[in-house]
Amino acid sequence: MIDKKLLLQDFEMVALSLKKRNNAMDDALERLREVITHYKKQLIELEGLQAFQNKVSKEFGIKMAQKVDTSDLKKELENNKIKLNELSKSVGELEQQIDLRLSIIPNLVDEKTPLGASEEDNIEIKKILTPRNFTFKPKEHFELAQQNGWIDFESGVKLAKSRFSVIRGFGAKIYRALIHLMLDFNEKNGFEIIYTPALVNEKMLFGTGQLPKFKEDVFKIENENLYLIPTAEVTLTNLYNDTIVSVEKLPIKMTAHTPCFRSEAGSAGKDTRGMIRQHQFDKVELVAITHPKESDAMQEHMLESASEILKALELPHRFVQLCSADLGFSASNTIDIEVWLPGQNCYREISSVSNTRDFQARRAKIRFKENQKNQLAHTLNGSSLAVGRTMVALMENHQQADGSIHIPKALEKYL
C-alpha cells in the first residue's frame, strides 16, 4: 500500500508516478482526491472544535474554582461535544474510505523503471548462452511430451478441465529432479527451504496485494475464508505478517516449492496447448525481506540465483527490464528472465524478480527495529524457477532429431 502520509502531503507526486503505469488510474485517483479533500476539510474543522473544547473547558474549570455561574459554559461544552462526536465519526469514516481506495491502487513506479506504454517498451538487459543451431526443425514441447509419453494432456482435461495436465513416467522423474535441483541451488545461495500451506486466508492475500483487486484471479474455497495460493510469495512473505524483527536478522531469505493455482482470467485463447499457461502448476519461489538500503542488491542476487540454475541446465536466457506499463500491481521495479524456446522461436518468461519496496510491508505490517525505532522493511519475490516452463525449455532446447531428449549433466545425479 502507498504511504498515506505521502499521499496526503504530496498527492500530485503520487498521481504522476501512478500515471506512468498507463493503466487508466485517473478515475480512481480523482475519486481518491475528492475523498482526501473532504477529509482534510473535516479534519481542520475537527481540530478547531477540539481547540474550542479545550479552551472552554479551561474557562469552565476556572469559573468553577471561582464559584461563578457556569451554566452557559456547560451548555456550550455539551453542544460542542455533540458536534465533536459527529464530526469525529465522519472523519473516521472518511479515513476508512481512503484506506479502502488505497488498497486497490498499485505501487509507485521506481525511478529505475523505464517509462513505457506497453510490454513492447520493455528493455533487454543482457543475453546468457547462445541458442543452439538446429540441423532440423525443432518441435514444440507438447509434441515432444506426447512422443516420449511424458505428459498426458487428455487425462488432465478428463480429470479436471482444460489447462490441467498429468505428468508421468520418465517425465515425472525429470519434473521431480528439476524441483530438487532448484531447491539445492537456492539453498546453496543462502535461501532457507520452507514448506508452507497451499491455502491461505484473505488477510494474507491482502498483505501481498492479490486482494481485494484481483479476486477473480484466485480460487476460493466455498463457504470458507480460504483461498488456494497463486504463488508461494503469499505464504513466504506473510510468515512475517504483523511482525517486528531485529535489524540483525536481515536479510531474511526464503525459498519454497509449492503447487500454485490461478484462474487465468483474461487469458482465453492464449497458450491453449501445452504447459505454458496452466490452472495448476509447480513453482520454486524466492522471497527476501531486507533493509531498505539493501533491496536493490538483493534483487540482483535473486536474479543471478535464478540464472545460475538455467546456466546449469544449459538453457539460453535473457534479462528483460519491464517498463512502467508492464509492472505488476505490487511491484515498483521488475526484471524478467526469459528462456529461449526453439520450438516457438522466441523467448518466454520463466522468472519475474520484483522489488516491491515497502508496499507489501505496509499492507502486511512487516517491520524491523533499528536504533530503538520500528521501520518498514522492503520485500522482494521471484521465481527460481517455474517448474513446468523449465521442463518445457529443457525439452525444446535439448531435443534430438529423433525426438529424444538429452539430459543436462547437472540433472543426471537427481535421476
Curated annotation (Swiss-Prot):
Keywords: Aminoacyl-tRNA synthetase, ATP-binding, Cytoplasm, Ligase, Nucleotide-binding, Protein biosynthesis. GO terms for cellular component: cytoplasm. One of its GO terms (biological process) is selenocysteine biosynthetic process. It is an enzyme of class 6 (ligase). L-serine binds at T231, A232, E233, E285, S383. The keyword Lyase does not apply. GO terms for molecular function: ATP binding; serine-tRNA ligase activity. Pathway: Aminoacyl-tRNA biosynthesis; selenocysteinyl-tRNA(Sec) biosynthesis; L-seryl-tRNA(Sec) from L-serine and tRNA(Sec): step 1/1. The keyword ATP-binding applies. It catalyses: tRNA(Ser) + L-serine + ATP = L-seryl-tRNA(Ser) + AMP + diphosphate + H(+); tRNA(Sec) + L-serine + ATP = L-seryl-tRNA(Sec) + AMP + diphosphate + H(+). Its EC number is 6.1.1.11. It is found in: Cytoplasm. Pfam families: Seryl_tRNA_N, tRNA-synt_2b. It comes from the Bacteria. Gene3D superfamilies: Bira Bifunctional Protein, Domain 2, Serine-tRNA synthetase, tRNA binding domain. Catalyzes the attachment of serine to tRNA(Ser). Is also able to aminoacylate tRNA(Sec) with serine, to form the misacylated tRNA L-seryl-tRNA(Sec), which will be further converted into selenocysteinyl-tRNA(Sec). NCBIfam families: serS (TIGR00414). This is Serine--tRNA ligase.
